[in-house]
Amino acid sequence: MSLLAQLDQKIAANGGLIVSCQPIPDSPLDKPEIVAAMALAAEQAGAVAIRIEGVANLQATRAVVSVPIIGIVKRDLEDSPVRITAYIEDVDALAQAGADIIAIDGTDRPRPVPVETLLARIHHHGLLAMTDCSTPEDGLACQKLGAEIIGTTLSGYTTPETPEEPDLALVKTLSEAGCRVIAEGRYNTPAQAADAMRHGAWAVTVGSAITRLEHICQWYNTAMKKAVL
């Protein structure tokens, strides 16, 4: 049975939650063994897949979880706004570390390596390709290039202002166009994740609301301060 077919079964049984275990850089939680522990806890709680950034984190996580891992490498480049898995060597390193799915930036922006080249390299390793997109045009273009999974990950992050709410309209548009959509980006409540599924998402990735303790504490502190002012 193919990995996609296996995921279809898991999603039907468990609801389609993917947990992104990406601590804030230099956080006390930003250690491979802690990332792996969070991933294992997420798997035991019913997550159908895990999203991991960085080769060391992926290696540590691969050793303890059996669910599929979506791997990425983030870089801050001087000559490109693209941050997610921008180079062939990133794809190769993630494949060697044990990723099942490799996600790349799928936006139409200046980049060191074309999207189609990165997709071909992912498929060369026999892995599934996911593209993190920001618009319907991004997603449809990446689908035509052969990406098996389209993420709404970058919606709101390629514009001057980032909205507070997730982009359900993008999920719906891409789903209705025949894309296998992972809704991602600002899904901070169970209700928002459920809305994404109702809008046609194949699965939903949740990160900050589950694995970034600093963000969760900030949300509570902000709300509680407002209540007493």
Swiss-Prot record:
Molecular-function GO terms, alphabetical: N-acylglucosamine-6-phosphate 2-epimerase activity
GO CC annotations on file: cytosol
Keywords recorded for this protein, A-Z: Carbohydrate metabolism, Isomerase
EC number: 5.1.3.9
UniProt cross-references to Pfam families, sorted A to Z: NanE (PF04131)
Keyword Oxidoreductase: no
GO biological process: carbohydrate metabolic process; N-acetylmannosamine catabolic process; N-acetylneuraminate catabolic process
Cystine pairings recorded for this chain: none
Catalytic activity: an N-acyl-D-glucosamine 6-phosphate = an N-acyl-D-mannosamine 6-phosphate
Keyword Secreted on entry: no
Coiled coil: none
Pathways per UniProt: Amino-sugar metabolism; N-acetylneuraminate degradation; D-fructose 6-phosphate from N-acetylneuraminate: step 3/5
Domain of life: Bacteria
Family: Belongs to the NanE family.
Function, as annotated: Converts N-acetylmannosamine-6-phosphate (ManNAc-6-P) to N-acetylglucosamine-6-phosphate (GlcNAc-6-P).
Entry protein name: Putative N-acetylmannosamine-6-phosphate 2-epimerase
